A protein has these predicted regions:
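Switch/communication elements of ASCE P-loop NTPase nucleotide-binding domains
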Residues: 77-83, 87-275
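Coupling/switch segment of ABC-type P-loop NTPase heads
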Residues: 1-88
Length: 278
């Protein structure tokens, strides 16, 4: 429909009012059911103590949320953090302490030594902020049904309850430049991190990135998982924004390569620099 018809909403009169109401209710239901999380980039220098009232510090808020959720060792969210902080070479374990009810200190264990997270590199600070936020999101998507009942799965009747734990299914995490301050080898691991959260916890992502390494690894995952082989569904969708304010979708082939080409100044920039050096 032409946008001119809806310049002042009078264009709605061309539709059946009952249909408009129905579509609006469907839209409202999906929006109300949608659970959104935001993970921003962590670029500021950190202090050893994180104030519980610091609403401008993304890492401090991530630590505060984790503490408030009362996640204990042995819970899947805690194990998730340990697994990925090792994968990103941050450390082997962590300890969170609250000081006088006013601030937290976050201690990283590396072999037989301990150090404040704030004293580590900015890459470690960035990735721990992301991992903590993801762990909190995973925890918040779960809720407990205290009644008994049943549901059908694979043509089988499954009884549940009481205290049956279920997970919300309409969750989106928005991530801003997750590659900030990370070594290229670690940037590529971000694809595995987000992919695991999607597969294991049914959580979707909307990611803004300039990282070639992250995107390249999604291509490898698509190939290895055969996501472009029917009847599989590819969970990855890449939209490229060109410098000239144009955008287009990047579709994967079965071998993981893209059908479309990126604009100038992205994947070809390294090649252009090498040519100038020759």
């Amino acid at each position: 429909k032409s946008n001119d018809k809806f310049a002042n909403l009078r264009g709605l009169k061309i539709f059946n009012p009952e249909n408009v109401k129905t579509y609006f209710n469907i839209f409202k239901f999906n929006v109300d059911d949608l659970l959104l999380f935001y993970v921003g980039s962590c670029a500021q220098k950190q202090s050893a103590l994180f104030s519980i009232r610091d609403t401008k510090n993304i890492l401090a808020q991530s630590i505060h949320d984790y503490f408030q959720l009362n996640i204990s060792p042995g819970e899947e969210e805690h194990d998730f953090i340990i697994k990925w902080m090792k994968e990103f070479e941050v450390g082997d374990n962590f300890k969170l302490e609250i000081i006088s009810g006013e601030a937290y200190q976050f201690i990283i264990s590396i072999v037989n030594s301990e150090t404040h997270l704030a004293d580590m590199g900015m890459g470690s600070v960035q990735i721990m902020s992301i991992i903590l936020r993801l762990a909190c999101a995973i925890k918040k998507t779960k809720y407990t049904v205290y009644e008994t009942g049943s549901y059908i799965s694979d043509d089988k009747i499954i009884d549940y309850g009481p205290n049956f734990e279920v997970r919300k299914s309409n969750i989106v995490i928005m991530v801003e430049e997750p590659e900030l301050n990370l070594h290229p080898a670690l940037q590529s691991k971000l694809a595995y991190l987000f992919h695991e959260v999607y597969v294991n916890f049914n959580i979707s992502f909307l990611i803004e990135t300039h990282s070639e390494y992250l995107i390249r690894n999604t291509q490898l995952i698509v190939k290895e998982s055969e996501y472009e082989v029917s009847p599989n569904v590819n969970p990855f969708c890449v939209i490229y924004f060109d410098q000239e304010s144009k955008k287009w979708g990047m579709n994967y082939r079965g071998d993981g390569k893209f059908i479309e080409e990126f604009g100038s100044g992205f994947f070809n920039e390294t090649r252009n620099i090498i040519k100038q050096m020759m």
